[in-house]
Every structure is written in structure tokens, then in C-alpha cells.
Amino acid sequence: MEQVFLEINEKLPGLLTTGGSDATFAESSKLIERCNLALISFTGTPTAVMDDTIKLMKSILASNESYNIDYDQLMDLMSQMVIKYPFDRILELFTVEELALALNSPIERLNIMTCVVVEYSEPSGLFASTTLIDILLQKYLDEDSSVNLVNSIEKVWKKTAQDELIRRRILENNYNFLSEVKNNEPNSLVFTRLLELLKICFTYLKSTEFRNSLFLISKKMIMDAVKDNILVFISICEYFTSIFSIVQDQKSQNPSKIICVRNCENTIMLFGDLFQNRSEFPDIEQFALSYLFKMFKILSYFDDLIVFEKLDNGYIHIEDGNEYLTDFLSFISPQYLYKKHLNIIKSKGHVRPSEISIIRNLCMSSDCFDIIKKNITAEDILAMPYLEQMILLEKMSQYDYSVKFLAQHLPKVMGSLISKDVKELLDRETFDFRLQVINNLIEWDVEQLHIWYEPLTEAKAQCMGTFASKDVGTKIESSFS
């Protein structure tokens, strides 16, 4: 173990040239790679020889020379060593003063080295009382910072923002700076970075830390984005969608966070108004509708339906005659539809290619499925193209109530599914859907499937044999959520 680090300490300095050959580049890469491999299984106490390796890397990164060396590989080794080291030992090798100087250096490699050290600080709030966080913020929100540096700083935020002291340093100590960037920054790239930072902080935020003036976006800013820069508007949509998703995901462990959504109510209604009047804003209709729909979907899944019901009744109007009714029925929470739009559910969800997305959505609720199952007949399913059949069955095979219905009431469909005749499976997409349906079904108890369990396992074996020479990974859920 120690030998590989001793070797790099002895040999690497002699390979550092500014115009070296491919041979010297390959040799230096080999030395670095050996160290990386040695670290994989390393669990002991770092040695003085390893300390010397870190010091060597520091000197290389600090040099004004651009050596013929793989700097990405070197940074990877630095990262792995920082991870493996006890952090008090790291602080003996990197003082706060050194890190600040490195972060302020015009040499980007040193900036990124500092990011690595701060990212893996232990505890994560260790540097909250230093200026390092302030400098990182300045560089993160500097339009001249490179993509590599910005990505490295984002890793710092994602790792350290879980600490309340770090969040306080970012959101309170730097409140004036962040507010200035938010309200006065004409650069869309920097504004988008700020939104990303706020999203990261919000993930760990307590509801008491939520400041409307920082986390909310004014009506003027949103309208200016609609008129002048649709990409900024899309970023704002994605920002709020992420905020709402975080609240929904954390509703069990952090229920008080729902107040943040209520604070956003006026903004939500503004998005609804923009949707309702989309004909006045061609860019929204052409580029941003899908982003609004993602936001509406998340809001419809909240247990507290007051905000979404107000949005529905006042602006998006889930009702007959709405040109986007099929879309809404395909992604709005089926439980919301069941509670508020029962008559529409009763009139929709017929088995035809144009309404498969509706049935797939309604299948996720047992209440909705009980209403539409009368429309799901073997004749209608088998009348559709085979791919559409599989798309429908892929969703029906995920829930116990619809699996039971499929196994007990649609024998013709089950028979078609397990048929050994695969001539209709002309493309890989169809094959993948069929295999996913079969896999979903055989996950259920034998009692649930009755006589179909054994034929399904045989059908799976046949599928695997049919495409034995191909990778059988599926990507269905990414296409149909």
C-alpha cells in the first residue's frame, strides 16, 4: 500500500514537464491510477508518505506552469485522499488561511482543490464561521466562473447545506448579496445558479428559515421573464416545481414545511393566470406548457387540496371543453379527480389508443379504477395495436386490484400476453414493454395470479431466449410516469 505512494512521490516530480511526450503523460497517469486503486480498499491510518503525496499534489496544483499531466485524474486522487483521511488530519495539511488563498487564486485548479476540501469537511458546518463560504458564493454567482468551478461549488452546497450553520452563513450573513443578485442581476445564467442554490438550501430548510423576500419571485420578475427571456421563465417554473416536490416528499418528517407552499399561493395563481391567458404569450404556449403542467401535477398531489382546487376552479378549469382535458386527466392526481371531478371520470377512460394515458393515470387509484374497469374489456384491448396493449398492461400490472381484475376477468388478454407467437414483436420497444408487464405480474403472489403464474414464468424465459444476444434493460418508467 505505502509503496505506491512512495513511488509516486519519487517518480512524479521527474515527469512534470510543460511539453512532455505521450510517454511521460502515460507514465504519470499510471502512477496516479495505482494510488487511486490502492485507496479503494484502504481502511487504515494515513501515513507520513501519504501526507507527502498530498503535499506534492498541492504544489502541482499551485504551480503557474501547465504540466503535461491529467489534472482531472490528479483531482480525483486528491478527492479520494480527502475522503479517506480523518478531517483533523486534513486540517494539518490545509489551513483555513491556505484554503482562502487557494480559493482567491487565479489558478482554477486551486479553487477546485479548495472545493474538494470544503465539500468533505467533517462536520459539514466546520467552515461556517470562515470567509470560505462567502468567497464560494461570490465565485458561484460570478458570470465569469467556469462550468467546472461552478459544478465543484455546487457539490459543496449539496454536501454542506444540510448543516444549519452553513445555511445561516449563506442565507443570513449573505442575505444582502443574494438579494442584490436576485433583484438586479440581468444575467440569466447567474440568476439560474441562484435558483439552484436556493433549491439546494430548501431541501434541508426548516420552515422558520423560509424568507419570502429571498425564496419567492415577484410578479414583475416573472412577467419580465415571460416577455423577455422564456428560458428564465422556464427556470423559474422548474424552481417552484422543485420546491413543491421537496415539500411533498418531506411531508411526513417535516410537515410544517407545507406553510412554504401557502406562502407561494399568489405566485401559483399567477402561473395559473398565465396558463389561462397563454394565447397572449406565444412563448409560453410553444415552449413552457410542459413545465407548467409538471408544477400543476405536483400541486394536485398535496393532501391539502385548497390551493390546487383554487387553481383549478379559477384558472386551469378541468372540465369538458378544455383543450387540454386529456392532458390533465393523464397527470393530475387521480385521487383529486375522484374527489372533485367524478362525473368526468365516469365519462372518460375508454380503451382506445387516444385515451391510454388517461387509463394509466386513473389506474393508480383503486377508487378510480373501480369506476373505469367496466370500460376495460378484452375485446377493446385486443383491438388496439400490440404496443398500445402493452403500454396499458404495464400500468395495470403494478397494482393488486388491477392485477386481480386482469387475472380473473380478462383471460383473453392474459392468453395473448403469454402467447409463444412473437412475430408481432417487431421492435425492441414493444419487446421491452411486454417483458416489463410479465416481470411486474410474476412479482405478485401465486395466489393472486392463479393459473397464470406458471405460463408467465415460461413466457419470461422465452422472452429472455428471444433476445439473448441483446441487453434486456428497460427504460419504460422514464417514458411513462
Curated annotation (Swiss-Prot):
GO CC list: cytosol; nucleus
Keyword DNA damage: yes
Recorded GO MF terms: protein folding chaperone
Pfam families: HSM3_C, HSM3_N
Subcellular location: Cytoplasm
Gene Ontology biological process terms, A to Z: mismatch repair; proteasome regulatory particle assembly
Ion transport recorded as keyword: no
Keyword terms of this UniProt record: Chaperone, Cytoplasm, DNA damage, DNA repair
Family designation: Belongs to the proteasome subunit S5B/HSM3 family.
Protein purpose: Involved in DNA mismatch repair in slow-growing cells. Acts as a chaperone during the assembly of the 26S proteasome, specifically of the base subcomplex of the 19S regulatory complex (RC).
Name assigned to this protein: DNA mismatch repair protein HSM3
Organism: Candida glabrata (strain ATCC 2001 / BCRC 20586 / JCM 3761 / NBRC 0622 / NRRL Y-65 / CBS 138) (Yeast)
